[in-house]
């Protein structure tokens, strides 16, 4: 599940479900593993790190105008699948409970994600938000969410070719919590991954916000791809401006020093670099009731 951040990937269907045995929560990782400076987080942990997620999401595709008209005509609600969401540092996993399979979504394939307010006045407090994720289409996504039928689109809008062109690139998926913030619900199995200690109240609208923030954090691990030619020209101008700046020794009120601020030389030495009438000095203040040396205590 660990991949190089610059590799191009596609969505996959896998049989792996994250558990306490094959993933580590972010809180557990921070307590047990030291942070190594200068080393990518993806290379520091042998196990994928769980940043967020939750149980009992209703997963499906955001209905287009055509699909909404079809559902209204046939009086059939849109198909939703009961699933669990896992936001890992390597990818986003959506576990389908009935299929016992996971949809693995690379972060580079996520075009945008947002919190969407459900347009239903009958919903209770704490159950009015859903998570929306727009991802690029690939063979797996096209198999799970086929493109709209062009013939039906022609009958509905008269512009089927345009509709097909605008829906080729991405698909918008929604994850709606099954339960509200304070609904009384007991899990079939004991929850040992999304515990209250690690993720707090992880249900309803709060769970949607937690998942959105977790995806936002993990997407920072995967920066944008190489810039275009227009963007590449900008660093050259910056480099030219930096090279045109005068030498640091010619600036006023600047002293050349390669030490640790404990080797300031006298005026006779510094006059070689700057003759502007200013003297170098350092002010230190010590308190009588505080020792200069102490001990570190781990809390």
From Swiss-Prot:
Under InterPro entries, the record lists:
ICln/Lot5/Saf5 (IPR039924)
Major subcellular site: cytoplasm
Q: Does the keyword Metal-binding apply?
A: no
Any GO CC annotation of this UniProt entry: nucleus
| Pfam families xrefs | Voldacs (PF03517)
Alphabetical UniProt keywords: Cytoplasm, Nucleus
Q: Does the keyword Transport apply?
A: no
Where does it localize? Answer: Cytoplasm; Nucleus
**Family per UniProt?**
Belongs to the LOT5 family.
Q: What is this protein called?
A: Protein LOT5
Report the source organism: Kluyveromyces lactis (strain ATCC 8585 / CBS 2359 / DSM 70799 / NBRC 1267 / NRRL Y-1140 / WM37) (Yeast)
